[in-house]
Curated annotation (Swiss-Prot):
Keywords: Amino-acid biosynthesis, Aromatic amino acid biosynthesis, Lyase, Pyridoxal phosphate, Tryptophan biosynthesis. GO terms for molecular function: tryptophan synthase activity. Its EC number is 4.2.1.20. Its cofactor is pyridoxal 5'-phosphate. The modification N6-(pyridoxal phosphate)lysine is found at K95. The keyword Amino-acid biosynthesis applies. This is Tryptophan synthase beta chain. The beta subunit is responsible for the synthesis of L-tryptophan from indole and L-serine. Belongs to the TrpB family. The lineage of its organism: Bacteria, Pseudomonadati, Pseudomonadota, Gammaproteobacteria, Pseudomonadales. It comes from Pseudomonas putida (strain GB-1). It comes from the Bacteria.
Length: 405
């Protein structure tokens, strides 16, 4: 496998190796083909790119900092740890990078209504935000379980004018919300734009979302060059569907000296049935329009994912991650709920930063690795979102621990 083959995809059929593709209902096929054409045209249009750059700068607040986490570095006693501060974006996470790109595309295509799925609620909030900014009605599909554990984000979406549809099917989480959003799209194909929140779904979504998120890695390269005069030695990011990770990784895939680590949600442990680690505990299959690694039972039925973090609670992973796993360019590991919580508390106390539980999975892996690495090793962790939304989850967990004590 030559280095130049790590960033080839997808091909014309939306495939990264054997992963990805367009597995959609016949009624949707013209729509995804049209979307792919429109996206290719937009990418080549200087006006579109100029407008995107304007909103990235003046609305999202980019570039965000690459911050040297000095006290965490001292605490670990090894590698020099940097945080790419995606939690400082408008709306508090990386999700808005993608939403602003897709809403500009929707506007360009003359669509009059936005729909989206959300798990932790951050993509829902970012979608509701851009819908408000561009005066478009917006419907968010959200699992009933997630609504329960993400009340603050539900209220934010309502404040921004979105309609929230609770999904009670299945486990009432992200997978089920995505199923309902796809049903809506089939029914309202003419005027509706489906704003997918991660690097999954039928082609062109995995590539399009990656491209809109790739600003994370591009900024990181320039910022580290300015600070240290060289490339990072390692990159660490959490992976649910995997958009913050693809955003950071893509820029560096052809740099053989850069070690890349994706961190899946290990839940209670990958050896149990309560985790969301599709690559470490799943097998290839088809879900939500693409072929990728999925959590499945012996009969090929999708099984329930579990993570303390609502944003990682998905039984699949973006197809480009599946490809990078198979060609061994990226190392995918898992972190348990407890390890993520420990890293969450450490980051709060050492850096005065309250990270999202999703990001805490990446932080936990960084804290594990850093002590074994030399002091001149440059490690970049993607701080994908802030932890305000997770206060109730952490409070409940701490209360449960106190009861057991």
């Amino acid at each position: 496998m030559t280095q130049s083959q790590y960033r080839p995809g997808p091909d014309a059929n939306g495939l990264f190796g054997s992963f990805g593709g367009r597995y959609v209902a016949e009624t949707l096929m013209p729509l995804v083909l049209d979307l792919a054409r429109e996206y290719e045209a937009a990418k080549a249009d200087p006006k579109f790119l100029e407008e995107l750059a304007y909103f990235q700068r003046d609305y999202i607040g980019r570039p965000n900092p690459l911050y040297f986490a000095e006290r965490l570095t001292e605490h670990c006693g090894g590698a020099k740890i940097f945080f790419k501060r995606e939690e400082l974006n408008h709306t508090g996470a990386h999700k808005v990078n993608n939403c602003i790109g897709q809403v500009l595309l929707a506007k360009r295509m003359g669509k009059k209504r936005l729909i989206a799925e959300t798990g932790a609620g951050m993509h829902g909030v970012a979608t509701a935000t851009v819908a408000a900014r561009f005066g478009l009605p917006c419907v968010i599909y959200m699992g009933a379980t997630d609504i329960e554990r993400q009340q603050a984000n539900v209220f934010r979406m309502k404040l921004l004018g979105a309609e929230i549809v609770p999904v009670t099917a299945g486990t009432g989480t992200l997978k089920d919300a995505m199923n309902e959003a796809l049903r809506d799209w089939v029914t309202n194909v003419e005027d509706t734009f489906y704003l997918i929140g991660t690097v999954a779904g039928p082609h062109p979504y995995p590539a399009m979302v990656r491209d809109f998120q790739s600003i994370i890695g591009k900024e990181t390269r320039a910022q580290l060059q300015e600070k240290e005069g060289r490339l990072p030695d390692s990159l660490v990011a959490c992976v649910g569907g995997g958009s913050n990770a693809m955003g950071l990784f893509h820029e560096f895939l052809e740099e053989p000296s850069v070690q890349i680590i994706g961190v899946e949600a290990g839940g209670h442990g990958v050896h149990t049935d309560k985790h969301a680690a599709s690559l470490n505990g799943g097998v290839p299959g088809v879900l939500h329009g693409n072929r990728t690694y999925l959590l499945q039972d012996a009969d090929g039925q999708i099984t329930d994912a579990h993570s303390i973090s609502a944003g990682l609670d998905y039984p699949g992973i973006g197809p480009e991650h599946a490809y990078l796993h198979e060609v061994k360019r990226v190392e995918y590991v898992s972190i348990t709920d407890d390890e993520a919580l420990d890293a969450f508390h450490a980051t709060c106390r050492l850096e005065g930063i309250i990270p999202a539980l999703e990001s805490s999975h990446a932080l936990a892996e960084a804290i594990k690795r850093a002590p074994k690495l030399p002091k001149d090793h440059l490690m970049v962790v993607c701080l994908s979102g802030r932890g305000d939304k997770d206060m109730q989850t952490v409070m409940n967990h701490m209360a449960a621990q106190e009861k057991q004590a």
